[in-house]
Amino acid sequence: MPKIKTLRSAAKRFKKTASGKFKRKQANLRHILTKKTTTKKRHLRPKILVSKGDISKVKSFLPYF
């Protein structure tokens, strides 16, 4: 069997935590930021965990992580 390739775009977007969960950056913080309040932008800043329904898909993208 050949080795499974890692999806490089996913490798740049997701990081695995010590407990085996995946962290990701939140959306809506790239452009058109002048309309958004400072509070909204501050709440979007921290990384959040990938939802339970998407974990299996992320794991298939990152077989060696």
From Swiss-Prot:
Residue ranges of the region described as Disordered: 1-22
Any Pfam family the entry gives: Ribosomal_L35p
UniProt-listed InterPro entries: Ribosomal_bL35, Ribosomal_bL35-like, Ribosomal_bL35_CS, Ribosomal_bL35_sf
Molecular-function GO term, any one: structural constituent of ribosome
Basic residues: bias regions: 10-22
Keywords, in A-Z order: Ribonucleoprotein, Ribosomal protein
Cysteine disulfide partners in this protein: none
GO cellular component, one term: cytosolic large ribosomal subunit
Entry superkingdom: Bacteria
Entry keyword annotation includes Ribonucleoprotein: yes
GO terms under biological process: translation
Family: Belongs to the bacterial ribosomal protein bL35 family.
Protein name: Large ribosomal subunit protein bL35
Organism: Buchnera aphidicola subsp. Schizaphis graminum (strain Sg)
